[in-house]
């Protein structure tokens, strides 16, 4: 793929007809690393008001030395990193004289080990034997050490100062391993964070889970320096406690003595779902607390669960678990009516009574938190910006991250400064927003917020035929309350320039998800020109998923759900927000960017694409990944169309295809559909494609960008051979740990003391040569604002820093659901909404999940074709913003 840009040659003709018949080619594999180079930074931005900031990046001073890289192969394999670290630590101490001397290696827990001085083994392979004391018997490991390479920190320093075009990955990896070695030994590592058991605090989440606090740490190349990004962190762990107590928490049993009967089927299923995959340790063998992983929970209680007991004469007899524990351990079970845990391999039939098992400490909860647990977590962890700043500074200055000075850093001559990095950012000007009506009022956001009072939509939709379906019980939502709600909605909608004419043509109560489809079919057949169904919901209910499945995919009807609490107690703000969503769904335009303030990219036809991939929760092999791409359909941009696909789930991806876990597999056809629709909507062919890609981690960026760029290019060529619009590919990242703080207290904004909306940083803590920037586009309401990170991976359109930063900030003001700027550009946000909506389209309506979380997988008889059909939007809806 050549780097010919639109700056050098305009190759697109506006008046050439798009041919909609040709197909797309298949995506390609990952790029050779020497072929794909992101564009260099085009210069620093200058637009906006300067603001003095602090960032939670700490300067790392590195010496101009070589570091020696060795491969470590430990047999037996597939041991936890914690065990591998113990093996290597023991090896370094045991073989100090002949091999390691005064070296204190940094080790990553897998295969990579680094030393400050070469080991006296040259390039030979060395085989060693290491013994660790075990429970009952010692464990012996065979360790093979092999020289890999010499890693130059001198080259890294040259890259940081701009004398080399590319930052050497091997040097960054070496530094990362060395700085993480000691905390990895002392704490519980989770990803790039470290946690320790609660001391002096206790934040239960319910369901056997609790909050653990810790810190995030990662080494990052920046302008002139390496930086250590340090942040406070929190996550959910399983509480170390008896399994009996764990079960009571999961099943909401206040006291185990209340559970006098065997578990019901629903109780057992719920308990199994929570405990499967967890490690437990036994308490009936004295000091030898053997650990097992739970694979199942038995249907029968311990008093009835049997297994074949081998007798001394070689024969086997059926024995219950309760009998066995009484005979073998003289242990009379207190709760023989409760089930057993099946542990180890399922085919081996190893059973343990609940009462002899404890949950092993230090197990992170990877399963999805419930809404209540998430709410509790947020309350426990939210910190205002000044509080978070103070906490991070205290953490670093007290050396409590690593429990004191780090001998491994000292070994390599590495020094971490303990002051946050000072830098100058800029606060970008907010765009003005054009409204409609007679007055054509203009709104100017203040700190990311503006008011719609006294303003009318730029293009409001007149609603003549509409219906109301109330799924809340009549005693909760009386007819007079419904009437009051519809009257107030009509008044607010008229004020907003989206008049709802007359009373609803249909207003009835209904019950349960099963009634949704027949009711909606009746409405479609009976009321010609029906534009909208307002659905009242009684809180969390599977009805929501069914409403969206039927409305979006089956019948092509616009639906707007409202929680009953907002009907019983209405507010102008809630009703106004409903109108924002309804107008967008029906094809209206709420507001537009004032044309004369828009960047120059708008001078030619341009399409804005947003893309995202959402994955099922870890360990859930039944649910597929979902890819979504949206595209703007006008020149404002305000209207968008969506495309969505079901992708092969992560569990089905082979080792060779790991690079494509995040790649949108059918991107070529998805972009092609959007380009055709853009042409139909505008009669123009876009000469520029601006692609905002969410959901990609830092390590995946280049691997994902190459096949996706090729797919976008192929989509264009499939429409016409010489159609080559300029592509700009930008990764949008929210999942990072960079935080910005105001140096001057007077510049803090809001109750949480955050940086102002529009704060932009493209120097000091950004990449030494590549085109990236941080932008905090929203006003923080709770906790510390997280700026979004933007990394430009391809740019045919030759954006300046100011142009792209301003464009991105303006797009954050075009999100239709609220009168606030949001944290990422609208197209990227919409792609997330589309992907999450598709999850509801896959929900099995027969399942009683209040959260709509049961998604049919292939094991439920739905093959890939059926899944693809389930997320296919009805032709009457597919060109609307049904996801708004």
Swiss-Prot record:
Pfam families: ArgoL1, ArgoL2, ArgoMid, ArgoN, PAZ, Piwi. Residues 242-361 form the PAZ domain. Residues 532-843 form the Piwi domain. It comes from the Eukaryota. GO terms for cellular component: cytoplasm; cytoplasmic ribonucleoprotein granule; nucleus; P-body; RISC complex. It is found in: Cytoplasm, P-body. One of its GO terms (biological process) is regulatory ncRNA-mediated post-transcriptional gene silencing. Gene3D superfamilies: 3.40.50.2300, paz domain, Ribonuclease H-like superfamily/Ribonuclease H. Keywords: Cytoplasm, Ribonucleoprotein, RNA-binding, RNA-mediated gene silencing, Translation regulation. Its main location: cytoplasm. Residues 848-870 are annotated as: Disordered. One of its GO terms (molecular function) is RNA endonuclease activity. PANTHER family: EUKARYOTIC TRANSLATION INITIATION FACTOR 2C. Required for RNA-mediated gene silencing (RNAi). Binds to short RNAs such as microRNAs (miRNAs) and represses the translation of mRNAs which are complementary to them. Lacks endonuclease activity and does not appear to cleave target mRNAs. Belongs to the argonaute family. Ago subfamily. This is Protein argonaute-4. It comes from Xenopus laevis.
């Amino acid at each position: 793929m050549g780097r010919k840009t639109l700056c050098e040659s305009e190759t697109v003709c506006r008046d050439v007809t798009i041919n909609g018949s040709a197909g797309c080619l298949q995506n390609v594999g990952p790029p050779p690393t020497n072929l794909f180079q992101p564009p260099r930074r085009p210069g620093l931005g200058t637009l906006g008001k300067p603001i003095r900031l602090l960032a939670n990046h700490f300067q790392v001073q590195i010496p101009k030395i070589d570091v020696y890289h060795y491969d470590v192969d430990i047999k037996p394999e597939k041991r936890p990193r914690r065990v591998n670290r113990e093996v290597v630590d023991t090896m370094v101490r045991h073989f100090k004289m002949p091999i390691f001397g005064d070296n204190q290696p940094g080790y990553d827990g897998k295969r990579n080990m680094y030393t400050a001085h070469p080991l006296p083994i040259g390039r030979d392979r060395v085989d060693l034997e290491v013994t660790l004391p075990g429970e009952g018997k010692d464990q012996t490991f065979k360790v093979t050490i092999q020289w890999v390479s010499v890693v130059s920190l001198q080259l890294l320093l040259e890259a940081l100062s701009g004398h080399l075009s590319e930052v050497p990955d091997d040097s960054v990896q070496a530094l990362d391993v060395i700085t993480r070695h000691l905390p990895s030994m002392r704490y519980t590592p989770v990803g790039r964070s470290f946690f320790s058991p609660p001391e002096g605090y206790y934040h239960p989440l319910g369901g056997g889970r609790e909050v653990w606090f810790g810190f995030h740490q990662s080494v990052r190349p920046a302008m002139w320096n390496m930086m250590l990004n340090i942040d406070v962190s929190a996550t959910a762990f399983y509480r170390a406690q008896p399994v009996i107590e764990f079960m009571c928490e999961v099943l909401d049993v206040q006291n185990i003595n209340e559970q006098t009967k065997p578990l019901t089927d629903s109780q057992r299923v719920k308990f199994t779902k929570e405990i499967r995959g967890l490690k437990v340790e036994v308490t009936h063998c004295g000091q030898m607390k053997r650990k097992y992983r739970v694979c199942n929970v038995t249907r029968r209680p311990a008093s009835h669960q049997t297994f074949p007991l081998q007798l001394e004469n070689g024969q086997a007899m059926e024995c219950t678990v309760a009998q066995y524990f009484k005979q073998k351990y003289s242990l009379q079970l207190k709760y023989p009516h409760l089930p057993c845990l099946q542990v180890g391999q399922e085919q081996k039939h190893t059973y343990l009574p609940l009462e002899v098992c404890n949950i092993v400490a230090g197990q992170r909860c990877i399963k999805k938190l419930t809404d209540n647990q998430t709410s509790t977590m947020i309350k426990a962890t939210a910190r205002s910006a000044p509080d978070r700043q103070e906490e991070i500074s205290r953490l670093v200055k007290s050396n409590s991250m690593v429990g004191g000075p780090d001998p491994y850093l000292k070994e390599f001559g590495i020094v971490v400064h303990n002051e946050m990095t000072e830098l100058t950012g800029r606060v970008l000007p907010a765009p003005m927003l054009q409204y409609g009506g007679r007055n054509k009022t203009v709104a100017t956001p203040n700190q990311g917020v503006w008011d719609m009072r006294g303003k009318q939509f730029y293009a409001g939709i007149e609603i003549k035929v509409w219906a109301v379906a109330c799924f809340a019980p009549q005693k909760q939502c009386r007819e007079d309350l419904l009437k009051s709600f519809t009257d107030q909605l009509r008044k607010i909608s008229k004020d907003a320039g989206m008049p709802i004419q007359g009373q609803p043509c249909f207003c009835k109560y209904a019950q349960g998800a099963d009634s949704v489809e027949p009711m909606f079919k009746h409405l479609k057949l009976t009321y010609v020109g029906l534009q909208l169904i307002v659905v009242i919901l009684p809180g969390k209910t599977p009805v929501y998923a069914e409403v969206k499945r039927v409305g979006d995919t089956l019948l092509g009807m616009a639906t707007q759900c409202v929680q009953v609490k907002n009907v019983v107690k209405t507010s102008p703000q809630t009703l106004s927000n409903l109108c924002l969503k309804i107008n967008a769904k029906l094809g209206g335009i709420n507001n537009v960017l004032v044309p004369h303030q828009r960047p120059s990219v708008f001078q030619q036809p341009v399409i804005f694409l947003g893309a995202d991939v959402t994955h099922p929760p870890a360990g859930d092999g039944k649910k597929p990944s979902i890819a979504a791409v949206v595209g703007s359909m006008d020149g404002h941009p305000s209207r968008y169309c969506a495309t969505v696909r079901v992708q092969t789930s992560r569990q089905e991806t082979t080792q060779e295809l790991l690079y494509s876990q995040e790649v949108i597999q059918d991107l070529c056809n998805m972009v092609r559909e959007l380009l055709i629709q853009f042409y139909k909507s505008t009669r123009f062919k876009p000469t520029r494609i601006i692609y905002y890609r969410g959901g990609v981690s830092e390590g995946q960026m280049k691997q994902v960008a190459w096949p996706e760029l090729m797919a976008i290019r192929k989509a264009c060529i499939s429409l016409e051979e010489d159609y080559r619009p300029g592509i700009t590919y930008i990764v949008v990242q929210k999942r990072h740990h960079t935080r910005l703080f105001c140096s001057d207290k007077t510049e803090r904004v809001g109750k949480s003391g955050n940086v102002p909306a529009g704060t932009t940083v493209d120097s000091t803590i950004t990449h030494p040569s590549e085109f990236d920037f941080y932008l905090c586009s929203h006003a923080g309401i709770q906790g510390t604002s997280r700026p979004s990170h933007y990394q430009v991976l391809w740019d045919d359109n030759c954006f300046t820093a100011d142009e792209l930063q301003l464009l991105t900030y303006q797009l954050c003001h075009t999100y239709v659901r609220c009168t606030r700027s949001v944290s990422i550009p609208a197209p990227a946000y919409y792609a997330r909404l589309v992907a999450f909506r598709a999850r509801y389209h896959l929900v099995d309506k027969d399942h009683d999940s209040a959260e709509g979380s049961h998604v049919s997988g292939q094991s439920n008889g739905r093959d890939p074709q059926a899944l693809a059909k389930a997320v296919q939007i009805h032709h009457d809806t597919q060109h609307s913003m049904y996801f708004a």
